[in-house]
């Protein structure tokens, strides 16, 4: 469990389906791109993203589980994202699944 973006104080509690804040969308996209490009160090060094990172991950407790998943990734694993959306403006519900196609047919 976890969230790429998890900023409860910034949430729009009255509108679950409001548009994501610009910073939350940018950060979520940055991390997803790092996952797709198999660049886990960018996810580890998320704080290099400055204010977008500080706003998106004000405390890392909900972000750290993602790093365990990336650390368990095998060569050839293909990431998929489902669900993949941001609720309340600042709460990413993006989940990452890694699959190894060559093992699925074995």
Segments the model singles out, each with a brief description of its role:
Residues 1-106:
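Surface-exposed, charge/polar-rich loops and edge strands
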């Amino acid at each position: 469990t976890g969230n790429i973006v998890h900023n409860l104080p910034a949430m729009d509690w009255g509108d679950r389906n409001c548009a994501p804040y610009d910073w939350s969308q940018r950060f979520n996209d940055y991390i997803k791109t790092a996952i797709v490009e198999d660049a886990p160090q960018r996810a580890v060094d998320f704080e290099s993203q400055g204010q977008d990172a500080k706003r998106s991950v004000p405390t890392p407790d909900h972000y750290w589980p993602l790093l365990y998943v990336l650390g368990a990734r095998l060569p050839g694993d293909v990431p998929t994202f489902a669900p993949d959306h941001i609720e309340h403006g600042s709460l990413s519900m993006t989940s990452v699944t890694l699959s190894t196609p060559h093992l699925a047919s074995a």
